[in-house]
Structure formats: structure tokens, C-alpha cells
């Protein structure tokens, strides 16, 4: 689950990570009164969307007066911001965050993420803050250091020698960065986060370190433990089909193609999308029904797929392991009859009880196109759609 920058800063502030003072606005009303409560001559006006690249897209403005800040708020609210992370459709700006400006001496990058190879949490630190960390890693790898955390001991300390030798930091700077890192670690563990990123972490002219921007993602599987975090969810920032899918235990991601996919298992779903592209078409979605799909689940999956007007055909690709193919076939037939599916439907069943499943499809009286192999299934649906 993602949250907005202002929400991330509120959480970090509770864990004693220094952040600039600010407030969120959903309209221009009352902005002047709230700005006057900030102790600054310069204000940063930031569009709040669940995507990076806001600055380059015009979503971050520096205001040198209260009047200029008000005007920026009026100009930003309601616009559609297009960044390299939003896709061409962009995201509408419904919230603006206004905060005190900071005097910047130096920008750093600091994040805490899960490293799947090490099965540990890893801090990533760089002297090249404010930039795309992937580009820094590619072009200047020596400017990045990583510190993995032993889960048995938890956070103890950053490797001061690495910080000192790689970035020429003095003992006071290292101590302040280490304290912030410890507080980030505490926030990460306490909230069941999956990522905390501060970019940039700035050193001010007075020698303080401040989180100028913040991003926090949470582990969806742990949200049941954190109702207070669930309340931060902004459904306006999410695709409505993905929200509906999550209600039924389905993993759904909307894409730009015209062939809907219903598959069990994330790996098989990705392979299915790949082979659709291989044969010259584009998938309309990623949809994993999981290992225990029922008739009701299959029906909801069809509804979600067909809610996309771009879908011109559907490929169902099921491997019966835990899931029995005859049960899935019955669910497909029942859902197809209930919904009167008009687009071409290709079904490939393999695994447990697949022969019984194929028989159910054949005897259904519905125009369901059967396929034995994945390649065969992909070619058939591509042919039907073109």
C-alpha cells in the first residue's frame, strides 16, 4: 500500500525523523492563514500523487511569498500531472502539501528496503541525493553504499568507516545520519513497511539534517495489524478495478492491451502475458485468481476483466495443482452463462482433472474455444481478436 508524502512525513515525525513543518490543502480556502503560521520566507508547494517525478513535471514549486504560494495552489489543484511513473494518462492532483523552505547545503539519499537475495533489510546511502538512484547506481556506483541489518540483532550502527571514507563525512555528520537511520529502522519495523525512502535527505546551512521528501510503502499482507495505516489509503489514487479485485482476493493490474487474461499463479500469469506479446498482441491485464478460486471468484474475475472497454477477447490459462480443473471449468461455464460473455473466450486447462474440465466446457453449449498448449491458446485468442 502506498501513501502520500505528507502522510509519510507525519509518520516519520512520530519516530523523531526531522521533517519541515507543513500542512495539506484540498482547496485554496484558508491557505493564507495556515501559511502565515509557518516560520519561513520561502515555501515549497507540492502536488500530492502516488508517483515520483513530480518536480520535473511541474508539480513542485518554490514560492517566495504567501501570495505566490496561494496562486500555485490554485493552479495545481485539479490538474492532471503526467510523470515518468504515472504513464501517459497521468494522475489528478487533489491535494497540495505546503511546507517551510529549507536552506540546502548538500543533498543525500537514504532508504531502507527489503533485499530478497540477502533476506535482510538493507540501508542504501548515497551522496547524490535528489536524483534517480538507479541512474546513480549505473553511472556512479562508488557513490552508493549499502548496509544490511542482521535480523538477530536489529539496528546497531551504520559502518562509520564506510561513510567517512566514501563521502568525507565528519563524526558529527555521521552521528546525525546514523540517528536518522535508526529512527527510520524503528518506523519500518513498527509499521510493517516494505520501503522507506528519503530523497533528498538534506544537510542545511546550519548543519541540521532534514527529510525534504519521503516515501513509504507498506506490506499489504500486514495491514490487518495496522488499522490506523489502512485509514491513510487514498482510493482516488488507485485503479478502481484493482480496488474491486482486492475485495475478492484477486491480484489485478490494468494494462493497455485488448486481450484479457485470467490465470492462476503470478509466474504463469507473466508467462501468459509474454506469449501474447510474442504472437503480436498486447495483454489488457495481469489477473491471478490464486489457488482456491470458486465459481463466485471466477465470476468476479470476468466482471473485472470485462469492465475494461478495451478488452476484445479473453484467455483463461489454468494449471491445476491445488486447484482442480473441473471445478474451474464449472465456474467458467456458470460465469459465462450468467454474464452472457460476447467476446471470444479461449480456455487452456492443464493438470489435476483437466480431462473432466475439458468435457465440462465441451458439453456446456457455449462458444468456448479449447486449447491444449499455452502457445496454441495464445495464437487462437490473437487470431480471434485481430
UniProtKB/Swiss-Prot annotation:
Substrate binds at residues 264, 321-323. ATP binds at residues 46, 53-55, 99, 102, 107. Keywords: ATP-binding, Ligase, Magnesium, Metal-binding, Nucleotide-binding, Tricarboxylic acid cycle. Residues 9-244 form the ATP-grasp domain. Its cofactor is Mg(2+). Mg(2+) binds at residues 199, 213. Belongs to the succinate/malate CoA ligase beta subunit family. Succinyl-CoA synthetase functions in the citric acid cycle (TCA), coupling the hydrolysis of succinyl-CoA to the synthesis of either ATP or GTP and thus represents the only step of substrate-level phosphorylation in the TCA. The beta subunit provides nucleotide specificity of the enzyme and binds the substrate succinate, while the binding sites for coenzyme A and phosphate are found in the alpha subunit. This is Succinate--CoA ligase [ADP-forming] subunit beta. It comes from Wolbachia pipientis subsp. Culex pipiens (strain wPip). The lineage of its organism: Bacteria, Pseudomonadati, Pseudomonadota, Alphaproteobacteria, Rickettsiales. The gene is sucC.
Amino acid at each position: 500500500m502506498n501513501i502520500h508524502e505528507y502522510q509519510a512525513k507525519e509518520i516519520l515525525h512520530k519516530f523523531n525523523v526531522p521533517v519541515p513543518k507543513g500542512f495539506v490543502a484540498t482547496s485554496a480556502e484558508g491557505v493564507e492563514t495556515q501559511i502565515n503560521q509557518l516560520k519561513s520566507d520561502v515555501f515549497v508547494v507540492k502536488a500530492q500523487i502516488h508517483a515520483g517525478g513530480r518536480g520535473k513535471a511541474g508539480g513542485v514549486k518554490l514560492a517566495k511569498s504567501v501570495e505566490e504560494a496561494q496562486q500555485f495552489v490554485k493552479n495545481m489543484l485539479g490538474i492532471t500531472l503526467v510523470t515518468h511513473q504515472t504513464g501517459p494518462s497521468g494522475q489528478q492532483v487533489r491535494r497540495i502539501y505546503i511546507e517551510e523552505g529549507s536552506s540546502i547545503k548538500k543533498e543525500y539519499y537514504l532508504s531502507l528496503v527489503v533485499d530478497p537475495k540477502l533476506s535482510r533489510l538493507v540501508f542504501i546511502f548515497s551522496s547524490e541525493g535528489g536524483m534517480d538512484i538507479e541512474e546513480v547506481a549505473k553511472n556512479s556506483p562508488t557513490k552508493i553504499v549499502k548496509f544490511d541489518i542482521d535480523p538477530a540483532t536489529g539496528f546497531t550502527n551504520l559502518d562509520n568507516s564506510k561513510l567517512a571514507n566514501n563521502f568525507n563525512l565528519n563524526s558529527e555528520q555521521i552521528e546525525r545520519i546514523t540517528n536518522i537511520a535508526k529512527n527510520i529502522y524503528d518506523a519500518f519495523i513498527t509499521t510493517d513497511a516494505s520501503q522507506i525512502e528519503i530523497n533528498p535527505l538534506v544537510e542545511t546551512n546550519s548543519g541540521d539534517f532534514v527529510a525534504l521528501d519521503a516515501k513509504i510503502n507498506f506490506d499489504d499482507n500486514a495491514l490487518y495489524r495496522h488499522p490506523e495505516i489502512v485509514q491513510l489509503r487514498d482510493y482516488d489514487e488507485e485503479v478502481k478495478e484493482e480496488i474491486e479485485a482486492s475485495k475478492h482476493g484477486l491480484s489485478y493490474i490494468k494494462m493497455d492491451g485488448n486481450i484479457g487474461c485470467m490465470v492462476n499463479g503470478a509466474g504463469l500469469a507473466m508467462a501468459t502475458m509474454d506469449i501474447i506479446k510474442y504472437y503480436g498482441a498486447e495483454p489488457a491485464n495481469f489477473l491471478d485468481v490464486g489457488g482456491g478460486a470458486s465459481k463466485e471468484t471466477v465470476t468476479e474475475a470476468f466482471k473485472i476483466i470485462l469492465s475494461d472497454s478495451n478488452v476484445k477477447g479473453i484467455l483463461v490459462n489454468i494449471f491445476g495443482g491445488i486447484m482442480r480443473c473441473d471445478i474451474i471449468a464449472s465456474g467458467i461455464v456458470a460465469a459465462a452463462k450468467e454474464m452472457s460473455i460476447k467476446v471470444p473466450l479461449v480456455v487452456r486447462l492443464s493438470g489435476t482433472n483437466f480431462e473432466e474440465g475439458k468435457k465440462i466446457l465441451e458439453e456446456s453449449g457455449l462458444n468456448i474455444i479449447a486449447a491444449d498448449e499455452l502457445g496454441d491458446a495464445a495464437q487462437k485468442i490473437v487470431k480471434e481478436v485481430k
